[in-house]
Amino acid sequence: MNNMAVRVRFCPSPTGTPHVGLIRTALFNWAYARHTGGTFVFRIEDTDSARDSEESYQAILDALNWLGLDYDEGPEIGGPYAPYRQSQRRDLYRDVIDRLIAAGEAYEAYSTAEEVEARHLAAGRNPKLGYDNFDRDLTDEQRAAHRAEGRNPVIRLRMPERDITWRDLVRGETTFGAGTMPDFALTRGNGEPLYTLVNPVDDALMKITHVLRGEDLLPSTPRQIALYEALIRIGVADGVPEFAHLPSVLGDGNKKLSKRDPQSNLFLHRDRGFIPEGLLNYLALLGWGIADDRDVFGLDEMVAAFDVVDVNSNPARFDQKKADALNAEHIRLLSEDEFTARLKAYFAAHGHDTGLDDAQFAEAARLVQTRIVVLGDAWGLLKFLDEGAFVLDERAAAKELKADAVPVLDAALAGLEGVGQWTTGAIEEALKKALLEDLELKPRKAFGPIRVAATGASVSPPLFESLELLGRDRSLARLRAGRDHAAAAA
């Protein structure tokens, strides 16, 4: 399939919350399609009605939309190989099963698990070896007798009795030896198709040329190649796609990142205030890199450079600190207007209200853009503007609002009460004169008590700008309250 236009697919099952490893797979498929000018197909594997949910499906759509990973064919938009939800394709699978049986590529198997184990034990083999291909050559009479007993068969593919080898685009030449892979089930006993059937059949019918997926699926590849070869022989498939098995994503302690690990949950990162650019940049580094000396890049740059053969086969560790640092870099790369819009949307989504008008909010955003790692950090710096959220940090107050802060705050109040236009420049001039010149204080000793009294914290946006945003009346009221707190602590 080397000469065909690239067609890749992202085919999650709609169960649970989107996992960062799943989204990494989507990103690599998307980037490869965009790099090659190919097609990115989005398909939903919803054949397990007991586990699949519409809520999870909507969550996957939400994730793709938020990250900007647009697909060319799939649910919601359609395409030449619709439908793109497997639950709507059962007639297609039934037809393929019938054709495989008619061609002798697959057969009905009636053995129970207990019977298979008993045969292994009788032959002196490990009873847990799995299916033993016993039903391959049942006669019509034997099959009829099983049906008369009320047994429902599963359909199994007849595996070739030879090595199966392929050149994995990430891992190189890979071989599974003859006899290591028993005939495998394509359906359940009730006739429902299994993932082992529907995934390769859909890839064949949708003309998928490259399968980029997690390495946990590597052991299933020889079975799928055998099925592709059978599908070619019955005229369903044009060829066997190329495979690329992406490295595992590890969490703490060299364990594979699981859905139980908080950092695996895509939406927890969004809720903290990751922006798509930062998260996608970090996910791209889980197995790939744009250059040895460069970690920060945009999606357009990734598309221009990405080739799946450059993906590293070694496991990748999810490092939250590095992810945070990259997100901070991308926040700084946003224009001031874009950052303001992102921050305003984030605050609205999380119920944060600064009480500022648009111009004031833009100024507040400018003050915090270079001081945060995730958008959520901005609320910690700006919540002093919300009277309902303002709290005096006890540790900061114990350090800054002691008896020696009383004359500092008295002088600050006297200086500020004479300010005409309440602007950053006028506030700065008044405070520096009252405290640095008149009281001859060092800046930290002068401004520490004012910062804590006005913002409630020892860390805030620049002090003079913060007081302008807070406004004259609230600033003076908080300084008075801070002075009273310091006097009471004396």
Curated annotation (Swiss-Prot):
TM region(s), chain numbering: none
Residues that, per the record, bind ATP: 259
Keywords on record: Aminoacyl-tRNA synthetase, ATP-binding, Cytoplasm, Ligase, Nucleotide-binding, Protein biosynthesis
Gene Ontology biological process: glutamyl-tRNA aminoacylation
Annotated InterPro entries: aa-tRNA-synth_I_cd-bd (IPR045462), aa-tRNA-synth_I_codon-bd_sub2 (IPR020751), aa_tRNA-synth_I_cd-bd_sf (IPR008925), Glu-tRNA-ligase_bac/mito (IPR004527), Glu-tRNA-synth_I_codon-bd_sub1 (IPR020752), Glu/Gln-tRNA-synth (IPR000924), Glu/Gln-tRNA-synth_Ib_cat-dom (IPR020058), Glu_tRNA_lig_a-bdl (IPR020061)
GO molecular function: ATP binding; glutamate-tRNA ligase activity; tRNA binding; zinc ion binding
Cross-referenced NCBIfam families: gltX_bact
Family that this chain belongs to: Belongs to the class-I aminoacyl-tRNA synthetase family. Glutamate--tRNA ligase type 1 subfamily.
Protein name per UniProt: Glutamate--tRNA ligase
Species this protein is from: Mycobacterium sp. (strain JLS)
